[in-house]
Structure formats: structure tokens, C-alpha cells
Amino acid sequence: DFASCHTNGGICLPNRCPGHMIQIGICFRPRVKCCRSW
């Protein structure tokens, strides 16, 4: 969720993570990804 995403150093982004980031989870709905830099 949103809180655990931020705890892990990620940010919530719609649809998918950009090329320089990796997905570490989801935020609100499955379409909203939790992304983090490499």
C-alpha cells in the first residue's frame, strides 16, 4: 500500500514504472505501481 511503499523508499506511479525504476509492489489498485530507483 501507499505507506509501505514509502517505507521501502518507493513512490506510487500510475500504470507502470519508467525504465530507470523497478516495481517493488502496488499502491492503491493493481494499476498503481510502487516504483523505486535502481
From Swiss-Prot:
Keywords: Antibiotic, Antimicrobial, Defensin, Disulfide bond, Membrane, Secreted. GO terms for molecular function: CCR6 chemokine receptor binding; chemoattractant activity; identical protein binding. GO terms for biological process: calcium-mediated signaling; cell chemotaxis; defense response to bacterium; defense response to Gram-negative bacterium; defense response to Gram-positive bacterium; positive regulation of flagellated sperm motility involved in capacitation. Neutrophilic granules. PANTHER family: BETA-DEFENSIN, DEFENSIN BETA 4A. Monomer. Homodimer. Disulfide bonds join C5-C34, C12-C27, C17-C35. Belongs to the beta-defensin family. This is Beta-defensin 1. SUPFAM superfamilies: Defensin-like. It is found in: Secreted; Membrane. It comes from the Eukaryota. One of its GO terms (cellular component) is microvesicle. The gene is DEFB1. Has bactericidal activity. Active against E.coli ML35 but not against S.aureus 502A. May act as a ligand for C-C chemokine receptor CCR6. Positively regulates the sperm motility and bactericidal activity in a CCR6-dependent manner. Binds to CCR6 and triggers Ca2+ mobilization in the sperm which is important for its motility.
